[in-house]
């Protein structure tokens, strides 16, 4: 398995955009649209896991997430997805580790993540900060992890 950190100039950008847009998770369409619109700027990246030459998972490293602007946390890991056929192989853990290494290399001591999932990210070492309002009028859990 290979993990690539990508900008829009990466050879696999279009392939991962297509994969995200067609995956079984509805948020994949949101990521694909952001990729098509070239919304990843500066140090923001999409990370993709490839197995046998095809994408099987992805996540993103971004400055902002869906929290209200009054919360000044950054950067974020988001859009964590692994294809159902490849789950149980620790691919999401490897994606998270790749993002942590990238964040550390870029001088960030922590990475934040929002999620409605209970108990999922704690197993990777994330610590819950609390429940925070989002731009969508919902409340999400906010987690952090040292990079």
Model-derived features with residue positions:
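C-terminal "cap" of GNAT-fold acetyltransferases
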Residues: 112-117, 133-147
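Short amphipathic alpha-helix that is part of the acyltransferase structural core
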Residues: 1-34, 46, 50, 147
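Conserved GNAT acetyl-CoA-binding A-motif
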Residues: 103-115
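Conserved acetyl-CoA-binding loop-helix of GNAT-fold acetyltransferases
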Residues: 79-82, 88-101, 113
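Conserved beta-strand in the GNAT
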Residues: 48, 54-65, 76, 81
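Short loop/turn motifs at secondary-structure junctions and domain boundaries
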Residues: 37-43
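Conserved acetyl-CoA-binding loop of GNAT-fold acetyltransferases
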Residues: 124-132
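A conserved beta-turn-beta hairpin within the catalytic core of GNAT-like acetyltransferases
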Residues: 64-77, 87, 135
């Amino acid at each position: 398995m290979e993990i690539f950190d990508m900008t829009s100039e990466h050879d696999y950008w279009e392939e991962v955009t297509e994969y995200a847009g067609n995956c079984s998770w509805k948020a994949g369409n949101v990521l694909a649209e952001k990729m098509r619109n070239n919304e990843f700027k500066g140090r923001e990246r999409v990370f993709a896991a490839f197995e046998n030459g095809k994408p099987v998972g992805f996540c993103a490293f971004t400055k902002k997430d869906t929290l209200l602007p009054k919360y000044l946390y950054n950067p974020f890991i988001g859009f964590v997805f692994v294809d159902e056929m490849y789950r149980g192989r620790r691919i999401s853990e490897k994606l998270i580790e790749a993002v942590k290494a990238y964040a550390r290399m870029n001088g960030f001591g922590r990475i934040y993540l929002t999620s409605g999932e209970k108990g999922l990210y704690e197993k990777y070492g994330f610590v819950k900060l609390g429940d925070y309002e989002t731009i969508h009028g919902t409340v999400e859990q906010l987690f952090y992890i040292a990079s």
